[in-house]
């Protein structure tokens, strides 16, 4: 950005390299290490350890720690925006517009892909280089038998080499030696053919024995499988029978429990009904007793009131009779209080008669004698 960039002012302090903390000997860790016998410049751990030889100055220096604030893997580099995505495709498009042939474009594309692949492998694997493996110590070269002829490959190679000698040897050797060699070669060929026949026979016998053993093994396996299946079926049948028995027993026990619970509930309901009836009867009896007591008290009070009123009336009548003049000889008709309350007196008299009669009282209160 040049002059238009943001100006960051930095003030250099007394410790610009930030090394004061490394020289501070009053920290908690320094105190603990010194108490354990450590001194500045020494390595941690046993001095006579087997790996103490490999210690260097880096083993006694400070450890650099960086704060990891992302989810990338260890050693992964984040994209800082300096990589242009799609640049190769853009170059491919420009090449087609410029009239490049398809072969050239394909070669460039392959070159770019190889470059990207190599770059990825360099980051992933690093400086590892893979080398073609050779013979290890102690390996033994074994002859591979061909399936068609049953002859080892090494024998065939030797045979071809022997049967095809060089032209220089042919010219140098005399004709007698040629005939001897031919005889020897023919004898060797006969021996090899015999060996081949023997090997073929052995293979046949081996294959027959293997087939017989395999058939016997297969029969044994079939028998074992049949036995295992029978055992499994028997076990399953036994388990099913046990399950049925358990289910029946559980059903019977559950039915018994239900019946017992039903009878208990019925009994409890009956008991509750009886208790309710008894409570109601008791309440009714109490109410009837209270009613009778009230009626008796009311009747007693009424009788007392009627008696007191009758006495008052008789007194009033006597006073009136005494107050009338007796010398005239004629009596004036006076309206007494008895005529006024005649109907009420009759009712009161009937009531008194009823209270005196016990049979009438029983009829009134509906009491069975």
Curated annotation (Swiss-Prot):
Tell me which domain of life the UniProt entry assigns to the organism this sequence originates from: Eukaryota
GO CC annotation terms, alphabetical: nucleolus
State where composition is biased (Polar residues). Answer: 153-167
**Key words of the record:** Nucleus, Ribosome biogenesis, rRNA processing
Its predominant location is nucleus
* Composition bias, Basic and acidic residues: 228-237, 304-318
Q: Mention any Pfam family matching this sequence.
A: G-patch
Cite the record's Low complexity compositional bias ranges.
322-338
One GO term under biological process is:
rRNA processing
- The G-patch domain is annotated at 25-79
Query: In its keyword annotation, does this UniProt entry include Transmembrane helix?
Result: no
Presence of the UniProt keyword Cell membrane in the record:
no
What compartments host this protein? Nucleus, Nucleolus
Q: List compositional bias (Basic residues) regions by residue number.
A: 218-227, 267-292
Which portions of the sequence form the region Disordered?
1-23, 147-338
A Gene Ontology molecular function term of the record: nucleic acid binding
Q: Which PROSITE patterns match?
A: G_PATCH
Function text: Involved in rRNA-processing at A0, A1 and A2 sites and negatively regulates telomerase.
Xref: PANTHER family? G PATCH DOMAIN CONTAINING PROTEIN, PROTEIN PXR1
Family named by the database record: Belongs to the PINX1 family.
| Protein name from the UniProt record | Protein pxr-1
Q: Which organism is it from?
A: Neurospora crassa (strain ATCC 24698 / 74-OR23-1A / CBS 708.71 / DSM 1257 / FGSC 987)
UniProt lists the gene as pxr-1
């Amino acid at each position: 950005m040049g002059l238009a960039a943001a100006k960051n002012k930095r003030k250099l302090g007394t410790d610009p390299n930030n090394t004061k903390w490394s020289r501070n000997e009053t920290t908690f860790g320094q105190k603990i290490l010194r108490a354990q016998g450590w001194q500045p410049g020494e390595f941690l751990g046993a001095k006579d350890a087997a790996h103490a030889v490999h210690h260097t100055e880096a083993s006694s220096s400070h450890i650099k720690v960086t704060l990891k604030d992302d989810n990338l893997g260890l050693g992964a580099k984040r994209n800082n925006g300096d990589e242009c995505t799609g640049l190769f495709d853009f170059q491919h498009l420009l090449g087609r517009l410029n009239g490049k042939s398809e072969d050239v474009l394909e070669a460039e594309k392959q070159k770019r892909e190889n470059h990207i692949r190599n770059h990825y492998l360099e980051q992933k694997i690093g400086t590892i280089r893979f080398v073609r493996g050779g013979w290890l110590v102690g390996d033994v070269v074994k002859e591979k038998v061909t399936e068609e002829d049953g002859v080892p490959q090494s024998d065939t190679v030797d045979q071809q080499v022997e049967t095809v000698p060089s032209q220089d040897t042919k010219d140098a050797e005399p004709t007698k030696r040629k005939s001897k060699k031919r005889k020897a070669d023919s004898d060797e060929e006969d021996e090899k053919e015999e060996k081949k026949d023997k090997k073929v026979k052995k293979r046949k016998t081996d294959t027959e024995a293997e087939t017989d053993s395999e058939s016997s093994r297969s029969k044994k396996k079939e028998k074992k499988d049949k036995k295992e299946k029978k055992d499994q079926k028997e076990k399953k049948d036994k388990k099913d029978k046990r399950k049925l028995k358990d289910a029946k027993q559980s059903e019977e026990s559950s039915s018994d429990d239900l019946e017992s619970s039903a009878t208990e509930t019925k009994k409890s309901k009956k008991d509750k009904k009886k208790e309710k009836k008894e409570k109601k009867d008791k309440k009714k009896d109490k109410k009837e007793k209270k009613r009778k007591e009230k009626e008796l008290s009311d009747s007693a009070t009424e009788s007392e009131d009627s008696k007191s009123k009758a006495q008052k009336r008789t007194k009033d009548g006597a006073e009136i009779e005494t107050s009338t003049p007796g010398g005239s000889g004629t009596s004036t008709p006076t309206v007494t209080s008895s005529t006024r309350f005649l109907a009420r007196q009759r009712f009161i008299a009937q009531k008194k008669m009823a209270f005196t009669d016990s049979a009438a009282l029983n009829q009134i209160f509906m009491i069975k004698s």
